[in-house]
Amino acid sequence: LRYLQKHYWKTKYSFNFPRMRPSENGGFQPNVVMSDRELAQVTFATRIFDHDVDISYSTRESASFRDNMARLGVTTMSAESKTEPGGYYSYPQTLEQFHVSDERTAKEVTLALKNLGIEPVWKDWDQSFDAVNCQEHAATTTV
């Protein structure tokens, strides 16, 4: 990371530590499963290493774990994620790549963050996320 920051200093860097989960179709089973405690330790170590880097948590993590980590170093979270190919355009749900643990709607995630004293900021640089439709799509919330 330090090399990249030195040579590409105008770039913003981020980390995501998605835990490998068994696939819904049973094809993939992880050899090692990282505990909540271990993921928290990796998150804290990363935050100590670099206080400016973004740290993202996906909907693979449980709602309670994401809520608890929101004030402890995580900067972005997804909401209403679809994990199957074409999942935002094709229904019904087929070929899910992995299980989504946090199944809350974007509105529910927003409310949970507000209840923690965090002001959610929606991704606003893509035309598909306008103020009218932001709650109908998966979104990224900056915390």
Predicted regions, residues:
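Conserved binding/catalytic microenvironments
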Residues: 3
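Auxiliary Fe-S-binding modules of radical SAM enzymes
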Residues: 6-143
